[in-house]
Each structure stands twice: as C-alpha cells, then as structure tokens.
Design a protein with these regions (language model features):
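Active-site/ligand-binding neighborhood in enzyme catalytic cores
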Residues: 1-63, 69
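Phosphate-binding glycine-rich loops and adjacent basic patches that engage nucleotide phosphates
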Residues: 1-12, 148-162, 219
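Soluble or luminal CAZymes and related metallo-dependent hydrolases
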Residues: 37, 189-190
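Flavin (FAD/FMN) cofactor-binding core of flavoprotein oxidoreductases
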Residues: 176-178, 191-219
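Residue-level signal for secondary-structure boundary elements
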Residues: 13-16, 121, 206
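Mid-domain catalytic core of redox enzymes
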Residues: 56-169, 175-184, 188, 196-201
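Short glycine/proline-enriched coil/turn segments at helix->beta-strand junctions
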Residues: 49-52, 76, 205-206
Length: 219
C-alpha cells in the first residue's frame, strides 16, 4: 500500500486527474452502477430469456449428468432436462447438488468458509452530518473493534442516489467481524448500533430520515 501511495504522490498531477471534462459533461468517475440498482441486470436477462422460461421459488435438490444432457432434480419431485447447467449458488449449496456424481469436488466446495453480513443504509440532510465528507467512504480497522466494518457515501459516489441537500450513507456489518450482530439483532437494533458508530465517527445531529437493512446469511 505504501508503495502505491508513493507512486501516486510522485505521479504528475495531470495524469492523476486526466483532462478536464468538456463543458456540460460530468466529471469522470471510477464508480459505475445501474441507476435503478443491481436488479437491472437480472431483469434485463429475464426480459431477454423470456419470463415464461423462468422458474421462481423452485429449489434444486441435485444435478446429475445423463450422457450429453443433465438432469435437474427439484425438491418438489420434478425432474428437468437441460443441455447445460450453470450453478450460480453459494458453494455450500452447490456442493449438495453435485455430491451425487462428484463427491471430491463437493467436499472441496463444502470447505469454503462463508460468513453472514448486512448493510444498513441511512439518509440524512447534509447539515445533519457534522464532519465534512471527503472521498467516497471509509474503512474501519479491525483493531478498533467497532460494530461496523466500513461505510460508503453512496450519494457522493453516485450523485443521483439522493437530492442535492441530502446524503445517503451505507454501513457494512458482519462478515469476519462481529458476525453475531447480523443474526442476533432485529432491524431496529442493528440500525441503532450502526448509528451509534457513525455518530462517533461522523457526528450526527438528528435521526435518519430513512433507513433500510439488507442481510445475507452465509453469503
């Protein structure tokens, strides 16, 4: 990291910022996402494939090779036939599906460690955050033993995420640090814990105008 910082420090300023944007053009950013969120991608895939070909709420028990094809066994007892199978599931779920025909690979996949995590998104008026927000967020060193791992200034990374007079902040909880918070606290308690930490770091003058918790258990 120190070497990277030294390289950036010694680099000419022009190469850091690049050419200035043309009049009427937004400044260049290294952060990109869909304006309507990540669901834009699966929705586009569904539109392309045809929603009549998509099975929602169907759990797969196992997949097995059958010559040049594959059999997909659902927990409902139904069996589907496919030319190809792509597993986009967590390693522990994929291991259960393939253990019938490749026990060695299933064992290796089962050994991959997973942890639960959550994000807590909160919105404030700009004047209700005391500390000037520079950059796009911060990472909390594990040695500080705080209940959040990091925070992203979502509305600064992506200006369209909040009105000009507001801030949208997202905190990360769990993973390999204080994972129990994701399991043990309800949404209200988890949000309160995050706000306590953010108040210490950023200085909050009021309660958030909006909050939302998302959890990923073992994923």
């Amino acid at each position: 990291i120190l070497g990277m910082l030294a390289a950036v420090k010694n680099r000419p300023a022009a190469t850091l910022s690049g050419p200035p944007p043309k009049p009427g053009q937004p400044a260049m950013t290294y952060f990109m996402s869909f304006k309507r969120g990540m669901e834009t991608l699966p929705q586009a895939c569904a539109d392309y494939i045809g929603k009549e070909s998509i099975r929602l709420g169907a759990s797969v028990r196992a997949v097995e090779p059958r010559g040049k094809e594959w059999s997909v066994f659902l927990t409902s007892g139904e069996e589907l036939t496919a030319d190809h199978v792509i597993l986009g599931t967590a390693a522990y779920d994929s291991a259960n599906m393939i253990k019938g025909f490749n026990a060695n690979l299933a064992t290796q996949m089962s050994a991959i460690q997973w942890s639960s995590s959550a994000t807590v998104t909160v919105a404030f008026k700009r004047e209700d955050v005391k500390v000037p927000l520079r950059g796009f967020g911060f990472i909390v060193p594990k040695v500080e033993n705080r209940r959040i791992n990091a925070s992203t200034y979502s509305s600064i990374k992506w200006s369209y995420r909040a009105p000009d007079d507001s801030l949208l902040l997202r905190a990360f909880v769990g993973g390999g640090h204080h994972e129990e918070l994701v399991h043990d606290l309800d949404d209200a308690a988890l949000t309160a814990a995050v706000l306590e930490e953010m108040d210490t770091i950023l200085g909050l003058k009021s309660a958030p105008a909006f909050s939302k918790v998302y959890r990923w258990f073992k994923g």
